[in-house]
Amino acid sequence: MDHYTELGEANTKDMFRKAYEEGYAVPALNFISIEQFNAIIDAVIEKRSPVILLASPNLHRQLGCEILARIVQSGIDRIHGCGLDIPVSLHLDHGMTFQHCVDAVEFGFSSVMIDGSALPFEENVALTKQTVEYAHRHQVTVEAELGVLSGAEESGDGEGNGESLYTDPQQVEEFVKR
């Protein structure tokens, strides 16, 4: 198991805390190719900006967590090679199962998103709680999804299906408490 700090990554929650205190935003950017990854690292170096690198489900399936973590480590090495110490984190975006999140934590991701939004409320709560308990033992930040946004997430084509499944605001407080 590689802890994200061994790969040179920053804790996502710490990045958010500092950004909030100092009044700036941290970009969270998906990359789907090495060219995009290198362009992001070039921009991080040029702008001296922290970044959260998002590993999409497709990229995760294609490369796996270990290779993704090593790619990000190479970018962090490039940043350090320029004499810079800029926070970078690797985030599993839309992890659909507990095992996806475990794999990400085991191979050095500093944050994960567990997406149980397609599950009934109680199952989503249970899945999220299981993921949070595991990830927090490794100082890994967790994002969870409750409900879906109208549009692209519903149908995959950006058109929506006419039957929106917005997040129920009354469920949010209960979801967070549990």
Q: Model-found features: residue ranges?
A:
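Terminal accessory/targeting
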Residues: D2, E6-L7, F16, Y20-A28
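Alpha/beta enzyme core
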Residues: A10-E21, I34-L59, E66-L84, H94-R178
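Short catalytic-loop micro-motif centered on adjacent basic/acidic residues
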Residues: V26-N30, L90-H91, M113
